[in-house]
Amino acid sequence: PLAEFEQTAAAIGAGQLDRRVPQWHPRTEVGRLSLALNGMLAQIQRAVASAESSAEKARDSEDRMRQFITDASHELRTPLTTIRGFAELYRQGAARDVGMLLSRIESEASRMGLLVDDLLLLARLDAHRPLELCRVDLLALASDAAHDARAMDPKRRITLEVLDGPGTPEVLGDESRLRQVLRNLVANAIQHTPESADVTVRVGTEGDDAILEVADDGPGMSQEDALRVFERFYRADSSRARASGGTGLGLSIVDSLVAAHGGAVTVTTALGEGCCFRVSLPRVSDVDQLSLTPVVPGPP
């Protein structure tokens, strides 16, 4: 038995952590020793696997953060360069229309402020800061979102539909953040479709979930773009977000906020057939009532 123990120990020392010593009768000293050693080896293997997994996650997180900082720096550089250029024209007295020049500077500064706000929100979500939770009626939020969208684009046909389903679309969530989810989805539909494209906001229930949908009959997206549309700073058209005043983070924020609420967001689309963004959230009736105590988030 000792020779077999020695061979197993050598194999483990060489990195074969799945090796075990032979089992002997548990009533013998050798049997009890083999049982104890195998238990210890199993714990070591689990600990090493956990450490490797944590290290891999840390590397992935570091890579994502590095890419995020690179993208953010690039996006911030664009409005800064524009502001600097117009400011230099003003300093040199080369601009004929000073009002237009100052308006462009103000516009770029405003866009940069929106970008910084979006970046700070994503940083909070990445850090898993707690949300301020309460009961939220999604029907009321959807109605407000449709009303606001009509005010934003009065020429467009924007409708609200209630989906058939059991119960009410009430969830446990942060009302201001859920309003932002709807606001971003509706703004995305309006900004990236022609005025002739209808936009429909739907709300209801499906099984244990509350459902929100924002659909349009615009040009749609390719499946390749649909797979990446929730990535940060990803644009199906590299010029479209800048042309419409967006930051390229709206759908990423939707994805992160929905995930923070324990839900999921998907998109159904095809070229020439419009887009339908669908948000599924757990209904409040299925949440432990003890968890309804509001959680106040810490400072950013």
Summary of predicted features, one role per range:
Residues 1-11, 24-39:
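HAMP signal relay modules and closely related sensory coiled-coil linkers
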Residues 107-112:
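Short alpha-helical segment of the dimerization/phosphotransfer core of two-component systems
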Residues 127-132, 170-173:
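Conserved micro-motifs of the catalytic ATP-binding
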Residues 221-233:
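Short conserved segment of the HATPase_c
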Residues 27, 31, 132-147:
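A conserved beta-strand-to-alpha-helix junction within the catalytic ATP-binding
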Residues 196-208:
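Short beta-strand/loop element within the Bergerat-fold HATPase_c
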Residues 262-263:
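Conserved glycine-rich
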